[in-house]
């Protein structure tokens, strides 16, 4: 019976969570591992009543994602969760629910880098006052920097994308290998 390692990948919007997660999934599956990605944004969109980004809605979405992880854990070698997950107390609750074999990966990028890449135009919209609660950018909606994490990757320099992908994938691969042999 499998017991997936869970990799909770947190960081502000556009730090590279989805990019690194997608790369890791491909690499791991090429080595025979069974991998599930549970994207926080995808789960958020499945609610009948659309969730916002206030503390209550973020907590609800994070806890729902954690419950999905628990329900799917015995089917996979790794579950990777790209999610903003900006509230420290909620991350601590999720860690308790999903431990053992829970790993928090913190992706950091400086604001200048985030504004420069901004593929969805979120930072521009926040600067224009169109978005008033952009997590970690708007004063009304802070991003609590994790007090404890298992891996921190600075994704500020896009030229280091290959290095970031390698760090991310190597970390996950090493954690999978510590508890199991090749599938």
Q: What is each model feature region?
A:
Residues 1-4:
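Phosphate-binding P-loop
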Residues 6, 37, 102-106, 150-152:
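Conserved beta-strand scaffold positions in the cores of enzyme catalytic domains, especially
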Residues 9:
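Hydrophobic anchor at the beta1->P-loop junction of P-loop NTPases
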Residues 13:
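The conserved Walker
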Residues 17:
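Conserved lysine of the Walker
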Residues 21-67, 72:
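Conserved substrate/cofactor phosphate-moiety recognition/catalytic segment
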Residues 56-99, 104, 124:
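Glycine-rich phosphate-binding loop used to anchor ATP phosphates in small-molecule kinases
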Residues 108-111, 116-183:
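Small-molecule kinase domains that catalyze NTP-dependent phosphoryl transfer to phosphate-bearing small molecules
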């Amino acid at each position: 019976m499998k017991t997936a390692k869970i990799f909770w990948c947190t960081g502000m919007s556009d730090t590279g969570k989805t990019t690194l997660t997608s790369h890791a999934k491909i690499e791991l599956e090429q080595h025979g591992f069974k991998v599930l990605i549970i994207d926080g944004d995808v789960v958020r969109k499945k609610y009948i009543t659309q969730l916002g980004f206030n503390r209550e809605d973020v907590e609800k979405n994070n806890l729902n994602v954690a419950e999905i992880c628990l329900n799917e854990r015995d089917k996979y070698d790794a579950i990777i969760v790209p999610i903003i997950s900006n509230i420290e107390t909620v991350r601590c609750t999720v860690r308790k629910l999903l431990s053992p074999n829970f790993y928090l990966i913190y992706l950091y990028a400086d604001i200048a880098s985030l504004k420069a890449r901004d593929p969805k135009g979120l930072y521009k919209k926040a600067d224009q006052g169109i978005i008033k609660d952009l997590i970690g950018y708007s004063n009304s909606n802070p991003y609590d920097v994790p007090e404890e994490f298992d891996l921190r990757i600075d994704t500020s320099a896009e030229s280091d994308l290959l290095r970031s992908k390698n760090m991310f994938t190597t970390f996950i691969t090493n954690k999978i290998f510590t508890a199991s042999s090749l599938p």
